[in-house]
Design a protein with these regions (language model features):
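N-terminal glycine-rich phosphate/pyrophosphate-binding loop and immediately adjacent elements
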Residues: 2-137
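A conserved FAD-binding loop/helix module that cradles the flavin
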Residues: 55, 464-486
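Rossmann-like flavin
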Residues: 93-203
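Short beta-strand to alpha-helix junction loop
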Residues: 163-172, 214-235, 384-392
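A glycine-rich dinucleotide-binding beta-alpha-beta segment and adjacent secondary-structure elements
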Residues: 182-196, 346-352, 406-468
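Helical element adjacent to the flavin cofactor pocket in flavoenzyme catalytic cores
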Residues: 209-260
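Mid-domain catalytic core of redox enzymes
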Residues: 249-365
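C-terminal segments that line or cap access tunnels to active or ligand-binding sites in enzymes
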Residues: 315-424
């Protein structure tokens, strides 16, 4: 019987785990090295501009609402959000633009016309992606892949009976290229590989299901911005009696005879019947479990992509931009080869611009916008980031200024910069990778670290570096899996 739990890290996975355990009557403590909750999902303000620091895309809101419903609370009283009518604005170097509607039929009608693509190509693609999701959701996303009982259920038999459906023998790019005729449409759907920090030229065709989450379920924005997800779950956890200790660094997970006893913090040991690490799995082993060898297969796994992010206060409004904006590169393949083969950034690269002031006007002064400008980069292998950031900044400004027909440099009212080394420093993400390990192999789902220790009893893992993967929705599901495992 587990009566007490200690969660290391107050990221989105840690918060969701603490909530689920507290609902069951378990006394939960959360220790967090930073002075605030949220991990990557935080916010800050400069000169009247508010910025969401980390994840900017919100899908599957029902998985947030589930936590309130489990606690017998009305989600509408504590967490409000709205669906976006336009999912994303896409821009290509030849000045082609496509403002992607969220509704499927509207998307197909507009995309077919813009790209001279047959409507049935889209509908067939969406149907196959939906089938993949429905067949594998229970098996791959909502259960541990490292327990025998998972593979003995009817869901497994059903999933295995449709192996050809998953396109595991193809890359995502190959699956997209075989379905669409226009290279721009292929590039648009290739982009979804970046949602888990992978390359469309390496990750499997299974990953067409990623776009299903956005296309079928929609894209949303919380009232007040992405940070409201963190704040609402933090308040829910406190109402449930979860005890938080901020500015508190975990030093070691204490064990005896391969069983968890608690966590050492400074000169104190917080005792607990179970420990859940929301910390990246690599530093969990390296820093907190020195008494055990770090699993070599975890350290050797290829990290996902990282990012350099420029937070710019822009003293002008751009009506042609929306909440989510993508400025594509000319050569997508070269871009990903640079990232994963050369651990570099290509000369021509894709730029993502997120502007929450489009939906939350108070996020920027009147007549201005808050730009979150992101470029995918390799993880930190010791590159000269100072030189790279300087180069990226100049090239981003040149690219966006050209495509928006406006000199952006004089419009920058304030600036903050986030690099992979800073990401690791602030969030303990190994090498600054945003999603733990990459999914550049067809077997990636099975190679991610399980949500429990196979050696240490009552030690569990949640968050983006373990099963089922990175991103807000999957971090929330990792909490659900830990909750179920801890009942055993």
């Amino acid at each position: 019987m587990k009566n007490t739990a200690l969660v290391i890290g107050a990221g989105i996975g840690g918060l969701a785990t603490a909530i689920r355990l507290a609902i069951r009557g378990i006394k939960v403590k959360v220790i967090e090295a930073n002075g605030y909750p949220g991990g990557k999902l935080t916010a800050f303000e400069i000169k009247g501009y508010r910025f969401d620091a980390g994840p900017s895309l919100f899908t599957m809101p029902q998985w947030v609402l589930d936590l309130f419903l489990l606690a017998n609370e009305d989600p509408k009283k504590h967490f409000k959000y709205k669906r976006k009518k336009v999912a994303c604005h896409y821009f290509w170097p030849d000045n082609t633009q496509f403002f992607a509607p969220s509704e499927r039929d509207e998307f197909v009608a507009k995309a077919a016309k813009t790209f001279n693509e047959k409507p049935q190509n889209f509908f067939q693609y969406f149907k196959r992606a939906e089938k993949k999701f429905n067949l594998t959701r229970s098996l791959f996303l909502e259960q541990s892949l490292h327990k025998l009982k998972t593979f003995l259920g009817t869901d497994t038999l059903k999933a295995l009976a449709h192996l050809n459906t998953y396109e595991l023998h193809k890359t995502l790019h190959q699956a997209n290229e075989q379905n669409f005729n226009n290279p721009k449409v292929v590039q648009l759907f290739d982009r979804f590989a970046t949602y888990n920090g992978s390359s469309p030229y390496q990750t499997s065709g299974m990953m067409t299901l990623i776009q299903h989450l956005e296309q079928h379920y929609g894209t949303y924005i919380p009232e007040g911005g992405m940070h409201q997800i963190t704040l609402s779950l933090f308040e829910l956890a406190k109402r449930l009696g979860v005890e938080f200790h901020f500015n508190t660094m975990a030093e070691q997970i204490i064990t005896d005879q391969n069983k968890v006893l608690g966590v050492k913090v400074s000169q104190t040991v917080f005792k607990a019947d179970m420990v859940v690490s929301n910390m990246d799995v690599v530093p969990t082993y390296v820093k907190l479990l020195p008494q055990y060898p770090t699993p070599k297969k975890i350290v050797k796994q290829e990290p996902s992509s990282a990012a350099v992010i420029f937070y710019w206060g822009i003293a002008k409004e751009f009506p042609q931009l929306d909440l989510h904006n993508i400025f594509f590169s000319t050569n997508y393949k070269a871009e990903f080869e640079a990232l994963f083969q050369n651990h570099a950034v290509a000369d021509d690269f894709t730029v993502y611009v997120n502007i929450t002031s489009k939906e939350v006007p108070k996020d920027a002064p009147k007549g201005c916008e808050n730009w979150f400008v992101m470029v995918n980069t390799p993880a930190d292998y010791g590159q000269d980031w100072e030189t790279l950031v300087e180069s990226l900044r100049a090239r981003i400004l040149a690219k966006l200024s050209r495509q928006l027909n406006t000199d952006l440099e004089p419009l920058i009212a304030c600036e903050e910069i986030l690099t992979p080394p800073l990401i690791e420093q602030k969030t303990q993400s190994y090498k600054g990778a945003l999603y733990g390990s990459s999914s550049n192999k067809a077997t990636a789902a099975f190679l991610r670290h399980p949500n429990f220790s196979q050696r240490i009893k009552n030690l569990y893992f949640c968050g983006g570096s373990v099963h089922p993967g990175g991103g807000i929705p999957l971090c929330l599901l990792s909490a659900k899996i830990v909750d179920e495992l801890s009942k055993e």
